[in-house]
Amino acid sequence: MAAAATPGAKRPADPARDPDSPPKRPRPNSLDLATVFGPRPAPPRPTSPGAPGSHWPQSPPRGQPDGGAPGEKARPASPALSEASSGPPTPDIPLSPGGAHAIDPDCSPGPPDPDPMWSASAIPNALPPHILAETFERHLRGLLRGVRSPLAIGPLWARLDYLCSLVVSLEAAGMVDRGLGRHLWRLTRRAPPSAAEAVAPRPLMGFYEAATQNQADCQLWALLRRGLTTASTLRWGAQGPCFSSQWLTHNASLRLDAQSSAVMFGRVNEPTARNLLFRYCVGRADAGVNDDADAGRFVFHQPGDLAEENVHACGVLMDGHTGMVGASLDILVCPRDPHGYLAPAPQTPLAFYEVKCRAKYAFDPADPGAPAASAYEDLMARRSPEAFRAFIRSIPNPGVRYFAPGRVPGPEEALVTQDRDWLDSRAAGEKRRCSAPDRALVELNSGVVSEVLLFGVPDLERRTISPVAWSSGELVRREPIFANPRHPNFKQILVQGYVLDSHFPDCPLQPHLVTFLGRHRAGAEEGVTFRLEDGRGAPAGRGGAPGPAKASILPDQAVPIALIITPVRVEPGIYRDIRRNSRLAFDDTLAKLWASRSPGRGPAAADTTSSPPTAGRSSR
């Protein structure tokens, strides 16, 4: 066995390193936790279901090693501890945005642990100005004050330090329970955090996800997205994911008044698509809880507790590898614990759905000369696959694009097909170039089949809408349509999968793209709320508990035409590229901030930051 490294001793140079790997830092945070600590004994069962400590191992006492089972040999310290001895010690408590030490969660006197039934949802949607000013950029500049090199700060450690500092500010403002900041930091720290891989990201990141489920209506959601790379700001080149050099200032302003009519159509009708999905197609993970053992598990999402369109909504979740990437999923079918945390059962598949509402099919029934209107009438009369394809092709840029076998699609449309029944002379002869990763994803998804649910004309007398059977007698039509890996919608789902996988690697992911087609209302339909009813043989909550007993289409929402549910296949190897490139982007930005320091003001100017964010919805 090699002798333990002594403080101050030089470490041998690494053998040949991958030129694409990030530069060495004193405190790497890319190692698996098992690599650093070795196996851990199974934690004891909590005395109450869903106790916060049941999700993550408890932190060891300060200054003591993270002990294992009795008789187990002491684990060696992380190499980062010995490497760091030549420089200033990394603070082992959260820092304020200005770089000063915050309250030590272990040693300083303070409030007791929070109420056992604390909930992240208690945070109001509106934040005071002084909290809106606490951006990640400002915090990062403050962290640079106390180090001799920018490489002393790792991306995951910096993000968690920021999140801890922010919850302390929320606590000081009376917006969360007293003692919650101390409690979350204890859960986060697995060992002296001079080594960033020695922290557990889920306590803090899960807290903020649960607190921001209102998304655009929540100012905390907007604040957390500042300095966070999302699917809308991540670019894709021939070599894979590309992080902008301006990632630290992304998502600084979200203005509703700048959004297009197509975006507003999506905002209004996403709840419609959610209602249809849970009413007819997808079982809820929060329904049917009757036994006493699980009685307290679904505090957030008990049946009837929320409006149907908010069931299984998600806030912003940051990746647990580097904290650089964030995603706000439309729908994640996953139970939650009493505090609101996502709490899937081990090795249980996680189905999630990205909803897209296609405004270009929202024709006006009062215009009988519109090609889409006449194609819709034919579809309602015949209900055949041929009539459905004719309706899809009734607009100038159809929402399903054909490309020939052996070729690749362009990036224009989110749904594509190679089936000759969809052959379109306008696209049959196209030749497109494609990167190797995208081509592999096209081949991976080419065998996927979508499910199409068709809806009939509203019954004005009974004020109901229901699915209708196809001409074949089946209620759900299977069509050889798959998600286009070259389209931004696919990339968005890929990023969401990366973030989820970083927290729940043992749960197989089941991503889907949901496409809602709806039309404007006819004169007699204006102002009417329609109740959703089952059609003949309609599925009720397939794959889980039955769908909600009551669901409606509100007067401002479109009349549904069809719902297309498309499974998505992703190659997990791409996740490694995202992780590696996010670290490189962080290191590059820190180097620039370090080089731009004012000589007379220390390592960084912490008060240099952008304006506070404004709430609003953007593509996630």
Curated annotation (Swiss-Prot):
Transmembrane segments: none annotated. The record marks 270, 330, 354, 356 as: Required for function. GO terms for molecular function: DNA binding; endonuclease activity; exonuclease activity. InterPro entries: Herpes_alk_exo, Restrct_endonuc-II-like, Viral_alk_exo. Keywords: Endonuclease, Exonuclease, Host cytoplasm, Host nucleus, Host-virus interaction, Hydrolase, Nuclease. Its main location: host cell. Residues 1-10, 603-620 have a biased composition (Low complexity). Residues 1-122, 595-620 are annotated as: Disordered. It is an enzyme of class 3 (hydrolase). The keyword RNA-binding does not apply. Residues 40-49 have a biased composition (Pro residues). Its EC number is 3.1.-.-. Disulfide bonds: none annotated. It is found in: Host nucleus; Host cytoplasm. Residues 11-23 have a biased composition (Basic and acidic residues). One of its GO terms (cellular component) is host cell nucleus. The keyword Hydrolase applies. Belongs to the herpesviridae alkaline nuclease family. Plays a role in processing non linear or branched viral DNA intermediates in order to promote the production of mature packaged unit-length linear progeny viral DNA molecules. Exhibits endonuclease and exonuclease activities and accepts both double-stranded and single-stranded DNA as substrate. Exonuclease digestion of DNA is in the 5'-> 3' direction and the products are 5'-monophosphate nucleosides. Additionally, forms a recombinase with the major DNA-binding protein, which displays strand exchange activity. Interacts with major DNA-binding protein; this interaction increases the nuclease processivity of the alkaline exonuclease. This is Alkaline nuclease. It comes from Human herpesvirus 2.
